[in-house]
Swiss-Prot record:
Disulfide bonds join 1121-1161, 1147-1177. Residues 1-21 form the signal peptide. Forms a complex with Ssk and Tsp2A. Interacts with Ssk; the interaction may be necessary for the localization of both proteins to the cell apicolateral region. The gene is mesh. The keyword Membrane applies. At embryonic stage 12, expressed in endoderm-derived tissues (at protein level). In late-stage embryos, third-instar larvae and adult flies, expressed in the midgut, outer epithelial layer of the proventriculus and Malpighian tubules, but not expressed in the foregut and hindgut (at protein level). Pfam families: AMOP (PF03782), C8-3_MUC4 (PF23263), NIDO (PF06119), Sushi (PF00084), VWD (PF00094). Glycans are attached at residues 24, 208, 320, 386, 458, 554, 620, 888, 942, 977, 985, 1048, 1066. This is Protein mesh. The modification Phosphothreonine is found at residues 1251, 1295.
Amino acid sequence: MRFKLFVVCALACGFMAFVLANENISTEEFEDQIINAVPEPVKVTKPKAQAEFVEVPKATPAPKKAEADNPKTKPLALQKPTLIPVVHVSSRGTDDILTVAGLKPEKMFGALIMPNDYLGELYDVDNSGYNWDPNNNVAPPTTYSTAAGGYTITAARLAELRSNFMYWYFDKDMYGGRGDYQFDIHASMTQLHKNLNFQLPFYGFRFNYTRLSLNGYLEFSDPPEYLTYPLVFPIKDWPAKRDPSFMGIFFSKCRVGRIYPSDIDQRTPGVYFRVERDLMGRTDRFGVEVRERTMWDIRQGVVGADTFIPKHVVIATWKNVSFAGGIDNSLYTTNTFQMVLATDEVYTYIIFNYAVLNWLSHTEAGGDTTKGEGGVPAYVGFNAGNGTQAYEYNPYSQNMVIRDLANRGWANGFPGRHIFRVDEQILIGSCNKDIDAALLPLTFAPESGNMLGGQVVNITGPCFDPAIRVTCHFDTESVLGTYVDRNRVICVQPYLKAEGYIRFQISVGTQRFKWRGKYFVETPAAATEKIFFTTDDVHKKNPAEIRITWNQYNLTSNANANVMISLWGYRETKIEPQLEYIDVIEASYSNSGSYVITPSNYINRNNINRDMQFGFLQINLTQPDQYSGLAISPVLWSRPIPLAWYMAPQWERQHGKRWARALCDNWIRADRFLRNFAADLPLCPCTLDQAVLDKGRFRPDRECDKDSNPSCLRHRGAIHCVVSGTPVAQGAEQQCCYDRYGFLMLTYDQMWGSRPRRVHNLGKMPWNEASKVPSLSMWFHDMRPFYSCCYWQEEQAVGCETYRFERRPSQDCVAYQAPGIAGVFGDPHFVTFDGTAYTFNGLGEFVLARSVDESNKFEVQGRFEQLPVNYYGEVKATQLTAVAMRGNTTTTIEVRLRPLHARWRYRLDVLADGRRVYFDRESLKFQHFDGVTVYTPTYLLNQSQVVVQFDAGIGVEVVENEGYMTGRVFLPWKFINKTAGLFGNWSFNKLDDFMLPNGQVAQLNLNDLRSIHTNFGIKWMLTDREVPGVGAALFKREFGRMSGYYANATFQPNYVLDPADFLPANRSYDLERAEELCGECMQCQYDYAMTLNRDLAHFTKNYYDTIVNMQAENAVRVVSCGVLQTPRFGRKLSFDFMPGAKVSFECNEGFILIGDQRRECLSNGLWNIPEYGYTECLREVYYTRRVAFIAIGIIFLVICPLMLCIVCGVYRYRQKQLKEDPQWQMPMLPRSRASSARNLRTLNYDDDSDTDASTLKKSRSYDKVYRTNEPLPGKPQIDFPAKKWDLDENDEDVTSSEGEKPKQLGRRSLHSASGTELDQHGSPVDGDHPDEDDDFDEADVHTGTTHPVGYHQPLSPEEADQLHRQQYSPTFSGLDSRTSGASSINYTPQAATQNRFGGVPVLPSNTQYYSRPPSSVNTVPLRTAPTPLTQDTGLPSPPLATSPTPSVQKSTEV
């Protein structure tokens, strides 16, 4: 019995050995026959370090199939064949390949049909005897070399390598090993761990290892224990169930299959794995060939990989694998596929080569046991793992059309080849013919371009046909595509009037636009710079030369191509903006990457577009077909530049030598017709610290950024500038620049100061109208005048000062209002807008801040997840992991914390309306969406800090450090008393911070965490449905994870705040450590005690200190005195405007400073009142004139009034000294001077004064009574000699008897010395008539007027006129009456008061000083009148005197 059992076992073992022998049949002898078909190596002289084809003699016909297949039969000696190129239509492509004449074997059928004929033994053999046939199964030598002067591959050799469908895989090596064959992988061990020793980026993560699985994938983490079909990734129950990270080329349970002895490729079935590292520096032959083949396959197969150079390559091959669960005969039903991984440790590309697919599914997935048909086919795609994201390659994955993988793809022209980019996102590089849906993702690169156009966009999506038209639609513009191959078309982006993300769609033939994507349009001023200016000469007025450079490979790789350099300009004279061609700078020039522009070559140009003052340089190919043989040409644009270097001679001929002034004046006139926009702009912060903290309204200016662009060409002296993040309602933009001391720079002080802009760089919707085009309108309205008014003129020019002071003046910070700030950090801790600090460990999604004002809505929400376990187990605390926000009608922005192992490149994920956006390129640092601007600092590439600015002035900042986030919200003052949420109500009152959704205020104790949790925090939890007062969640939902996945209202965190109260007594070290790390910061101590994580504690303290300092900085009221204008033609020695600042002034040479030389800023925010007037600078000549006029003015305004006052004073003094009769009144006389003189001659009354007070005649009032109060009591009576009493004012020769000075005497008719009175006709009046009144007048009878004593009636007008005609003497002598016959005044010789010629006594009688009684009263003189004296010399004679001698005519009685 035992013998029988032994025989049975022996037979069984023998049978198994036979089966295994057939399964793993050796092909060494067969390979030796093929290799030895050439009896001796052919020695060919080749140049050093260069591979050449081996020229072999013509060979005899190939041996028969039976002889070749029989391992016992030796092949006949073959002559040396000759390699000749022949056109071979391959089943894997249409490329021309090389074959061997006379040795083309017949097609063999079996488990595997190679894509190309097996020609390995006929390729070149090196000195070591190795055959470099691409299909050779023996691995090359492992002698890596990096020495200079190594192997150089030729274009022919590269074409030969790339003509093969499959990459290298070897089952032998030159040292007797198994090559790449993984003999340890079999049914009982389906995977092997492989160390890569380099970083492999994959789906956001990065790995330095992998696991090679027999089941058709490379994995990086453990799969779930049980799989259910169809497979769904990511695993929704993660982390309860494992969610593997893998690359699945054919994810299905497999086993090693078998091959037939008749198969051409007799390499051992199974799994192969090969790694080639450090290819960038290798010079050995195999390393160079692997690098070049992989590089060009990827560059030409995937859009956007034009600069990719592989650093490491992994080749994994599954050869002749069968499905699991099948019968023995099913082992011959096999699939062969290959995965090629290439990475430079930043980008990763994968090539899937499907050679043969004969089965679809294994038995556990429902497939049959014989053919592997039916059931759920294999999974093809990628899974990031850890429950994050996955990509399933549709329509092939888990679908019956999966067998078409071997006939689709068309990457590099091969059916069955599919290429993907997998480092951050999965981007397909192969066409997809069978998929159909309403919206299909379009793969294109680059994903952004200059607004001016010319960007070549490579597009992959549907499978293309050269006979079918392809239309590309960029926003509102459409262009036709250019066919490249079945997998790619090219569209050249047209000129677009838009910015930000626009719709990008294509249609094939007559189909609708169902392939769609988002294309980012870069504004010309912020676009990727492709033409560089080595100096700033292009901005000058008249440069000698301008040097430009560019990357020649941005146009073409053809070194012999020529380029054309042209000049373009822009203007806005109509509603539609005009970007027009100006001139050709160089018609044809070698594409060398540099050129020198000589402006003197264009002096004589007379261009019709000379009104254009700024424009662009454009470089394109002279012959478009030089770009990859296609009739297209890329276009390179410069940044906007001024055009004085080209247009200056033309402007000078048109406007004269002062053409800059003319251009400036034209702009000023036009700008004055436009509306004033400055009132709409936010005010500039006073200091740089305030500007940096105002995250809601201001962002760094690209032109002057302290972190990325400190040159500040148009703001010299500035170290940093900020601009308003979003356009205001009218489209304007604010700019604020700060000097090295952190103070605001003003245009009132210098031309380099802050300048507001009429048009924002982002433009304004709609972008296709004048004054609304991004960048171009800003340059037309704001940048262009800066050059013509200031940069090309003097700073003190009239146009520049008009530009600085009137049209673009800086806005000072007198009324600036710092924003309110609130934040969340740690596990988590909150600081409200009013400064209340508390802790709330909610688990789920909550409202951080929201507006209760319906007109200005905004929402900021946060997601909190539980912290990972620590050494002691579960941590009863949470942390912030995501923030979502939205304005009134703006785009929804979400910022997420990336998984731990996915933070190697990007720290945070940013989603705009659910679509991931990235900020890893300069032109993408600032991205504008509908109503919101998102940017990352220019010095960061890892997206660890993201700032979101809404058009309402709201800002949200999210910062990540070591996996721990903080979120801060910045609000302008218009939201005071209009906020709610976990950040409280901003009212400057801490008592109402805990406002509930219903508007009530919860009265809570900050130390009672349980009460805060249950009575306040949990009330703000979000759900996916709208809740009154709370709202709905804004977060993007992926893979079925709704708000309930994150929320847990029953979560009970630790409610004890002090670590000393909740840490066990045996953990005193942790308590001491917390105090050591945190000091007195309770939030830091709490976080360390809860998590034992030093990083969390450190950044909790850092975030807390930061927000407290921010609130303290913004709480301080900054006092500013505002603008203090610089005098024209002068300067200020300091630009400070803070309290205590003392600013001194100086003038330029040739000018004089007048006014205050120094002003001081007071503590009340006002400049001190000038003591000497407004400060200004005058030219010396003007200053001299001013001084002279001031002196003359002083003379007239000071000395003359002073003299007048002196005269008046003397006059008043003399008036007081005069003696006058109090009873006397001057009779009423006509106003005529002549009449007055005649009347005075007819009057003969006693005057109360002897003479005038001065030579200046003063009008007297003759209706008054003057009293002299004489004689004086106690004084002697003195008799004065008689004098000439009355002279006319024209008698200038009359000399007083008391001196030599001429004296003007009053024109009065005096009484005679005897006291005899005359009537109104000059006749004596008898004083012995007591019954008659002397003062009686006939007119008094009618008027009833009673005149005082001594009043004499004036002459009638007729009498006065008659008397005027007599031409009487000024002395009123008697000669007048003798010579005038018409006069009624008769000379009376008996009159005591007259001489013989009718003269008047010089001095009156002494009776004039006394009051005269009425005529009816007899009076006796007090003393006898002296003898009258006569003076006949020096007095004018009457004109009609008839004296016999001249002495008689000129004499006057004295």
